[in-house]
């Protein structure tokens, strides 16, 4: 069976490496690995993509659950801060715009918001989607530098076709990342589901490096003189091209730079930074035992949070991958699909900060971190609290606190219930329990609560609500806490 597995590969270096991995697992697991390879064969994945799948399966079947013990870690301190970097890096950055590519992670569907298409195609106002803001920012820097900065959209199989149909920019590259079968934990075999789309998952954004290399795009960019890539999530519009960071990476001869920001108590889903064996280390929450989550959340011990924005020196990456593949720490992501327990075997691109020489973590302000993960975030982004600039950047000061019932969890429902958007006063608090249709643009001041237990949405025709709690029944709205201005 091992010979059959190795028959999928041609590279002598990969063959030698995989033989070592396969020697570490039993023949029973070889049978399971072969089943995954056969399932993936019709996709014609690159040799690197298949290699990554086999390595991940060998690690998982060998008992690697991706858990990183906190006992061997120490706080990450003394990182350079963007606000304290010399302004002369701006000049270097401006002179280096011709060497820059911008890469956006565009594989997400926004399933937490009920989306069935690319999250980047969600509207943030009637005229702009996330992708429009991204293109506006790239075009701004193209204009400033008079250079055709390449934009690369890393898509999953979920988002590739729809994104390509929605973006006509001539300097945009559409890169398809690998996909792998979901693993049925009951049998170790590939998942069999009622719909084929449910049987697959992207292997995490750590796949970026090998997808770039296997597609040939990495070498193409380097051959064109592109030496630096700025990479960020497409749902984080605060992650824009930054001259000082670009100039710093180049002037300090770094191969890899990760942007981290001071962690808040609300920063839980995502990665924290620490030190391991004298190197920066990325800790995704799923890589930490639940018994240690309370410690992980202590900002005194783990004060920095991963923004998932990185800067890469592309010739260094190309040189590394021409010698051997990267093996990033494993992430075991449990899911339930149609009642079946499965795992997705993934990696995170930020984990490369621990492996690559000349890598560094740079502390950036929260103004570079505004991920939109929920409809609460989307309400705020669509409001007056966030200034959307023509150059694709965003700015904000104080943000409101919003609590929503499940009726608002999906984007389509949100757009139906709040079609005109909401405006907020500084430090406003809004609680919505039950579906409320805001018939007009509404300004929220102070603490406002609207609730009802009716089966159908209730209309609200107010243009302003201030320090009030209202409850609706069949006869209409009733004030429980009067408006303080009355």
Regions found by a protein language model. Give the residues of each.
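Short capping/connector residues at structural and topological boundaries
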Residues: 114, 118, 126-129, 242, ...
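Conserved N-terminal catalytic core of the sugar/cofactor nucleotidyltransferase
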Residues: 2-104, 111-119, 123-228, 454, ...
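Conserved core of the sugar-phosphate nucleotidyltransferase
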Residues: 160-314, 318-322
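Residues immediately flanking
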Residues: 106-107, 234, 314, 375
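Left-handed beta-helix
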Residues: 2-101, 247-486
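Conserved short loop/turn motifs at secondary-structure junctions
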Residues: 149-159, 234-237, 366-370, 374
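Short His-Asn-centered micro-motif
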Residues: 124, 134, 153-157, 177, ...
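Hydrophobic/aromatic beta-strand patches that form the interior of the parallel beta-sheet core
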Residues: 103, 122, 152, 173-175, ...
């Amino acid at each position: 069976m091992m010979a059959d597995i190795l028959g999928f590969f041609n590279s002598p270096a990969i063959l030698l490496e995989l033989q070592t991995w396969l020697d570490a697992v039993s023949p029973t697991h070889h049978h399971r690995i072969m089943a995954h390879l056969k399932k993936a064969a019709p996709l014609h994945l690159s040799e690197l993509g298949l290699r990554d799948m086999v390595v991940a399966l060998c690690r998982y079947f060998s008992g690697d659950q991706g858990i990183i013990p906190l006992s061997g870690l120490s706080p990450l301190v003394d990182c350079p801060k963007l606000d304290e970097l010399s302004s002369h890096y701006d000049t270097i950055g401006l002179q280096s715009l011709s060497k820059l590519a911008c890469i956006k992670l565009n594989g997400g569907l926004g399933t937490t918001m009920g989306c069935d298409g690319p999250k980047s195609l969600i509207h943030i106002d009637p005229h702009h989607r996330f992708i429009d803001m991204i293109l506006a920012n790239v075009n701004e820097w193209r204009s400033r530098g008079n250079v055709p900065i390449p934009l690369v959209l890393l898509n999953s199989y979920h988002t590739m076709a729809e994104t390509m149909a929605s973006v006509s920019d001539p300097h945009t590259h559409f890169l398809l990342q690998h996909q792998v079968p979901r693993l049925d934990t009951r049998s170790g075999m590939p998942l069999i589901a009622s719909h084929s789309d449910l049987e697959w998952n992207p292997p995490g954004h750590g796949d970026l490096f090998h997808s770039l290399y296997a597609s040939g795009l990495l070498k193409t960019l380097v051959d064109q003189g592109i030496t630096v890539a700025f990479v960020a999530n497409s749902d984080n519009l605060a992650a824009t091209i930054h001259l000082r960071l670009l100039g710093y990476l180049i002037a300090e001869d770094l191969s890899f730079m990760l942007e981290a920001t001071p962690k808040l108590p609300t920063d839980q889903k995502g990665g924290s930074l620490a030190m391991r064996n004298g190197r920066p280390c990325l800790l995704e929450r799923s890589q930490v035992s639940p018994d240690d989550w309370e410690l992980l959340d202590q900002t005194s011990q783990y004060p920095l949070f991963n923004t998932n924005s990185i800067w890469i020196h592309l010739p260094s990456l190309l040189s590394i991958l021409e010698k051997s593949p990267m093996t990033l720490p494993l992430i075991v992501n449990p899911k339930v699909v149609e009642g079946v327990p499965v795992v997705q075997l993934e990696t995170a691109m930020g984990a490369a900060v621990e492996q690559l020489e000349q890598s560094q973590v740079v502390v950036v302000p929260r103004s570079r971190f505004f991920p939109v993960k929920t409809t609460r975030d989307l309400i705020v982004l669509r409001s007056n609290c966030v200034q959307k600039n023509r150059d694709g950047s965003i700015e904000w000061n104080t943000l409101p606190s919003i609590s929503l019932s499940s009726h608002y969890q999906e984007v389509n429902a949100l757009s139906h219930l709040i079609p005109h958007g909401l405006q907020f006063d500084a430090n406003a608090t809004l609680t919505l329990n039950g579906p409320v249709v805001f018939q007009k643009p509404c300004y929220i001041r102070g603490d406002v609560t609207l609730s009802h237990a009716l089966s159908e949405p209730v209309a609200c025709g107010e243009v302003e609500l201030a320090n009030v709690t209202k409850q609706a029944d069949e006869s209409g709205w009733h004030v429980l806490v009067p408006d303080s201005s009355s």
